């Protein structure tokens, strides 16, 4: 088990050795608190976009279903007639310059896996730059937009935001509720009291502290041909090599089991780089991976490699609440 996996297990399931990291946690909390307080006090350069900015992020380390939720937000806003753009850090991307406009025909090593997935799925204008303020400026210079979604960036306080949405894995919760490196929190749990909306991935119903949403598998797509097949393409009990290089691989493996397949799990680091050698498995079985992994594997995919598309399905209460927020932010632009 890699060091990162051991840390995740300790954060979410407990380990006495974590007490040794509490002095470092104290320092981390001081830095984070100071950074946020400077933002609240209006110190430093804070960029206020001329169009509303909605930040969609986490306060925990590990996957929470953020990308599927961003895809849902894009399509939902478009149904209201809004012109939507997205900015992202572009983790792992190595573009020729920054800011960088992501195009669907680029590769993940240039554009980053999550930004490339978002553009290939939706065609949305998307700019990457660790400086999200610079990304917003570049995006607005490139075309007229009504609204910008920031893919993560909760802690990027130089970009003013009009709405903050935080996603939490309902099964994992906040782990031991301690901050890095003694726990999985990027910011103290109290930060949830200041955000606008909290979404719990996998919750069965809305909670007092937030809304429920789930990830619904929708289709299998062949990496080589692009052919879409229904979920019953594989018969019940089909064994598959399951590949997941995401923040919470076990959730993907559980999804395949819920589809009545028998996954042979192959967990990789989040944002992992792949090769033919790394994905040469025995015995010979179909390979099923996440859509995020697929954008990095198409160039060398075999005929029986597939990715599973999943769609975020938020609760009706969240949809109604979010529409109210859109009406508040864009009263003159929103279509019924």
From Swiss-Prot:
Q: In which pathway does it act?
A: Glycolipid biosynthesis; lipid IV(A) biosynthesis; lipid IV(A) from (3R)-3-hydroxytetradecanoyl-[acyl-carrier-protein] and UDP-N-acetyl-alpha-D-glucosamine: step 6/6
Q: Which Pfam families match?
A: LpxK
Give TM segment ranges.
Answer: none
Organism superkingdom:
Bacteria
Is Lipid metabolism one of the keywords UniProt gives this record?
yes
Q: Looking at the UniProt record for this protein, which Gene Ontology cellular component terms does it annotate, in alphabetical order?
A: plasma membrane
Please give one Gene Ontology molecular function term for this protein. Answer: ATP binding
Which keywords fit this entry according to its UniProt record? Answer: ATP-binding, Kinase, Lipid A biosynthesis, Lipid biosynthesis, Lipid metabolism, Nucleotide-binding, Transferase
Biological process annotations from GO: lipid A biosynthetic process; lipopolysaccharide core region biosynthetic process
Q: Quick one: which residues bind ATP?
A: 60-67
Q: So what does this thing catalyse?
A: a lipid A disaccharide + ATP = a lipid IVA + ADP + H(+)
Which EC number(s) does the record attach to this protein?
A: 2.7.1.130
Record NCBIfam families:
lpxK
Q: What does the protein in this record do? A: Transfers the gamma-phosphate of ATP to the 4'-position of a tetraacyldisaccharide 1-phosphate intermediate (termed DS-1-P) to form tetraacyldisaccharide 1,4'-bis-phosphate (lipid IVA).
Q: Which family does it belong to?
A: Belongs to the LpxK family.
Q: What is this protein called?
A: Tetraacyldisaccharide 4'-kinase
Its lineage opens with: Bacteria, Pseudomonadati, Pseudomonadota, Gammaproteobacteria, Pseudomonadales
């Amino acid at each position: 088990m890699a060091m990162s996996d051991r840390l995740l297990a300790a954060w979410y399931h407990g380990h006495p050795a974590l007490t040794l990291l509490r002095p470092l946690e104290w320092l981390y909390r001081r830095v984070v608190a100071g950074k946020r307080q400077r933002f609240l006090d209006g110190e430093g350069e804070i960029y206020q976009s001329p169009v509303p900015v909605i930040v969609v992020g986490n306060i925990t380390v590990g996957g929470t279903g953020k990308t599927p939720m961003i895809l849902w937000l894009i399509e939902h806003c478009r149904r209201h007639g809004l012109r939507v753009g997205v900015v992202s850090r572009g983790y792992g991307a190595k573009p020729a310059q920054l800011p960088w406009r992501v195009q669907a025909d680029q590769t993940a090593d240039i554009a980053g896996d999550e930004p490339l997935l978002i553009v290939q799925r939706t065609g949305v204008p998307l700019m990457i730059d660790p400086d999200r303020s610079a990304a917003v400026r570049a995006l607005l210079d490139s075309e007229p937009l009504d609204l910008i979604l920031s893919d993560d960036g909760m802690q990027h306080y130089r970009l003013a935001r009009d709405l903050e949405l935080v996603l939490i894995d309902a099964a994992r919760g906040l782990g031991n509720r301690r901050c890095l490196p003694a726990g999985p929190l990027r910011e103290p749990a109290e930060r949830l009291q200041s955000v606008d909306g909290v979404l719990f991935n996998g919750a069965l119903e809305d909670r007092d502290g937030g809304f429920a949403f789930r990830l619904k598998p929708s289709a299998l797509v062949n990496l080589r041909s692009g052919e879409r097949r229904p979920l019953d393409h594989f018969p019940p009990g089909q064994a598959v090599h399951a590949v997941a290089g995401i923040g919470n691989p076990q959730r993907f493996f559980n999804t395949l089991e819920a589809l009545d397949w028998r996954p042979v799990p192959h967990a990789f680091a989040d944002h992992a780089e792949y090769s033919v050698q790394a994905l040469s498995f025995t015995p010979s079985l179909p390979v099923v991976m996440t859509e995020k992994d697929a954008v990095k594997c198409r160039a060398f995919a075999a005929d029986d490699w597939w990715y599973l598309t999943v769609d975020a399905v938020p609760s009706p209460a969240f949809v109604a609440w979010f529409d109210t927020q859109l009406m508040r932010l864009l009263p003159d632009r929103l279509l019924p």
